[in-house]
């Protein structure tokens, strides 16, 4: 009998020893898919966050860049990944534009939304020698001159910064198509065009122009935020500059494939919240002019719905909406 009892006890102990680690989550590395190239804005935010995230989780967090198709390749990879909690993604505003533009049948509705990690605001930046000293002067000129007289850039046609520019004009009761949009491969080439006089303004983020602003080669006339930016305290908001409400920012968000286990999701969400609040993560982002953000449960879902609707309205005004 004693042998049987000891054997049973050993069996039970063995079961607990096996079942404990098998149910621990996470127990292996986690990957975050970034739809944009290494060294870009989204990549920088995610790598900064990932360093804190792996400290909180106790397992490695690997950042994987899946580029191509204007972000479609990477966003699709996130959507189609196994929903086991070990593959997450970094979504950007473009996924809220694809379906309206008709470029891909994917949207934020296809993802489990955790939270935004950070934002960088759009702005209106001109060359240092531009005749426009204020946004009010620039808007008045766009209003009074023929369509195409003034131009902007910052991304491709229908991209995030194009939406920022179109929304600004619509808020000022100006046909968004009056402003000529010059496609570019990003902020750097667009800012070169601004400084050379090739285009009137840059409606991407002043964060992308930070070194040029500090060198006095460009000026930011306004930021597209509800309140002034800590990074650019001298730049008025659109409301302050022209008396109209318009805000727009690029955001970088933590997401997962649909269908992730609720318990695993909660573990990841709580760890991610702690990671984003870590002093070294906050300071590293702020040093780059990036504003850290963390959404309460459900808050990002509401934001995403509002963002998608607002962007669709602007794209319709620009004559770019296909759906």
Could you tell me what each predicted segment is?
Residues 1-5:
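Positively charged n-region of N-terminal signal peptides that target proteins for export
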Residues 6-19:
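Bacterial N-terminal signal peptides
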Residues 23-110, 174-201, 292-295, 317-323:
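N-terminal (or domain-start) structured segment
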Residues 25-27, 115-119, 245-249:
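Short, flexible turn/loop "capping" segments at secondary-structure junctions
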Residues 27-29, 262-323:
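An extracytoplasmic/periplasmic, membrane-proximal ligand-sensing/linker region
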Residues 77-86, 99-189, 238, 251-284:
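Hinge/capping helix and adjacent helix->loop/strand transition within the periplasmic-binding protein
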Residues 93-103, 166-173, 196, 200-234, ...:
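A ligand-binding cleft/hinge motif common to bilobed small-molecule-binding domains
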Residues 208-277, 306-309:
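C-terminal lobe and pocket-closing loops
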